[in-house]
């Protein structure tokens, strides 16, 4: 049996925070605002995985009202989600992600993100695709106010 999940997340830029996307710290003058480390891509992937098994979303499992998750490492959160997915009897078919950002340029970091995500999801890098696009200076991402991401995951029963 196959299950498909879709994820979407948005975070606004904030001064004085590191920019962490896909488990990788990216040199930039701003980071993303959030209760955790605000890794927009890993949050999106977690939501896609949870959606595929009809288990809600990241906010249900790691609420931003819980001080235990303040400044949490999103890689650890994704690992917990993935452990839960595997306990339900699923493994990864493939994952396709899109980062939507005017700046900074993501291309130099894509392969590092793919590698890190493949480690977190215990799969071959060949099952992970990460790409980036801009909105041609339209909307909040085009005005460089934040970053969005989308992901689609295919899970298969072990």
Curated annotation (Swiss-Prot):
The record's Gene3D superfamilies line, in alphabetical order, gives: 2-C-methyl-D-erythritol 2,4-cyclodiphosphate synthase (3.30.1330.50)
Q: Which HAMAP family match?
A: IspF
Q: Which family does it belong to?
A: Belongs to the IspF family.
Q: What class of enzyme is it?
A: lyase
The entry's function note states:
Involved in the biosynthesis of isopentenyl diphosphate (IPP) and dimethylallyl diphosphate (DMAPP), two major building blocks of isoprenoid compounds. Catalyzes the conversion of 4-diphosphocytidyl-2-C-methyl-D-erythritol 2-phosphate (CDP-ME2P) to 2-C-methyl-D-erythritol 2,4-cyclodiphosphate (ME-CPP) with a corresponding release of cytidine 5-monophosphate (CMP).
What are the names of the required cofactors? Answer: a divalent metal cation
How does the record describe its quaternary structure?
Homotrimer.
Would the keyword Nucleotide-binding turn up in this protein's UniProt record?
no
Q: Which GO terms describe its molecular function?
A: 2-C-methyl-D-erythritol 2,4-cyclodiphosphate synthase activity; metal ion binding
Q: Which domain of life is it from?
A: Bacteria
Where are the residues marked Transition state stabilizer as a site?
Answer: 35, 134
Q: Which pathway does the database say it acts in? A: Isoprenoid biosynthesis; isopentenyl diphosphate biosynthesis via DXP pathway; isopentenyl diphosphate from 1-deoxy-D-xylulose 5-phosphate: step 4/6
Q: What is this protein called?
A: 2-C-methyl-D-erythritol 2,4-cyclodiphosphate synthase
Which residues of the sequence carry a binding annotation for 4-CDP-2-C-methyl-D-erythritol 2-phosphate? 9-11, 35-36, 57-59, 62-66, 101-107, 133-136, 140, 143
Note describing how the cofactor binds: Binds 1 divalent metal cation per subunit.
Q: Which reaction does it catalyse?
A: 4-CDP-2-C-methyl-D-erythritol 2-phosphate = 2-C-methyl-D-erythritol 2,4-cyclic diphosphate + CMP
Q: Which UniProt keywords apply?
A: Isoprene biosynthesis, Lyase, Metal-binding
Q: Does the record carry Plastid as a key word?
A: no
Write one Pfam family the protein is assigned to.
YgbB
Q: Which organism is it from?
A: Bacillus cytotoxicus (strain DSM 22905 / CIP 110041 / 391-98 / NVH 391-98)
């Amino acid at each position: 049996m196959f299950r498909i999940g879709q994820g979407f997340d948005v975070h606004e830029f904030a001064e004085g925070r590191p920019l962490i996307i896909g488990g990788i710290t990216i040199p930039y003058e701003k980071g993303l605002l959030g209760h955790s480390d605000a890794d927009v891509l890993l949050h999106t992937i977690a939501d896609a995985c949870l959606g595929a098994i009809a288990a809600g979303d990241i906010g249900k499992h790691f609420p931003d009202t819980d001080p235990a998750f303040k400044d949490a490492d999103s890689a650890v959160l994704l690992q917990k989600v993935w452990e839960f997915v595997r306990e339900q009897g699923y493994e990864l078919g493939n994952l396709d992600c899109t980062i939507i950002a005017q700046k900074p340029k993501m291309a130099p970091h894509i392969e590092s993100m793919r590698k890190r995500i493949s480690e977190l999801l215990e799969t071959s890098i060949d099952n992970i695709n990460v790409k980036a696009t801009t909105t041609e200076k339209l909307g909040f991402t085009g005005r460089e106010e934040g970053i969005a991401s989308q992901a689609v995951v295919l899970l298969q029963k072990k």
